[in-house]
Regions:
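Short pre-active-site segment immediately N-terminal to redox-active cysteine/selenocysteine motifs
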Residues: 1-4, 9-15, 85
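Non-catalytic, surface beta->alpha helical segment in thiol-disulfide oxidoreductase systems
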Residues: 21-29, 58-125
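A short beta-strand-turn-helix
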Residues: 1-4, 33, 78
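Thiol-based oxidoreductase modules, predominantly thioredoxin-like and allied folds used
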Residues: 9-12, 18-71
Length: 125
């Protein structure tokens, strides 16, 4: 198996496109994304309606109603990883457990490679 890279992104996320253009196009990064990870991009602004609304409790104790696919992904990002901005990247194992912390918007190829490599190393342990 392979570790998963969760990419919390948005259709209207300018910084997400900048990361994809400046970091993901690097040959070494692209090789890792294509060969060493299962990449799952979750669009927090996806307006596709859910079949039925879902009421959830937020980390701060308030209640929220999820009505769209994007609502579901933003709730996952906030409730599981404690973050609510894009881009947000986290490597996880097959049970959804984080492997190497997280990475946010920073056009830093060596830093991003380090983040990806730590995820792979921890996955193999």
């Amino acid at each position: 198996g392979k570790p998963v890279l969760l990419d919390f992104t948005g259709f209207g996320c300018v910084n997400c496109r900048k990361m994809e253009g400046a970091v993901w196009t690097n040959a070494e990064v692209a090789e890792k994304l294509n060969n060493d990870y299962i990449l799952i991009s979750l669009y927090v602004d996806d307006k596709t309606p859910l079949k039925e609304p879902i009421k959830v409790k937020r980390p701060d104790g308030t209640t929220r109603t999820l009505r769209t696919v994007g609502d579901k992904w933003s709730y996952l990002e906030e409730s599981k990883f404690g973050y609510l901005a894009q881009p947000f990247y986290v490597t996880v194992d097959n049970h959804g457990n984080p492997l190497s912390g997280s990475f946010v918007y920073k056009e830093d190829i060596p830093g991003y490679l380090d983040f990806l490599n730590k995820g792979i190393e921890n996955y193999k342990k």
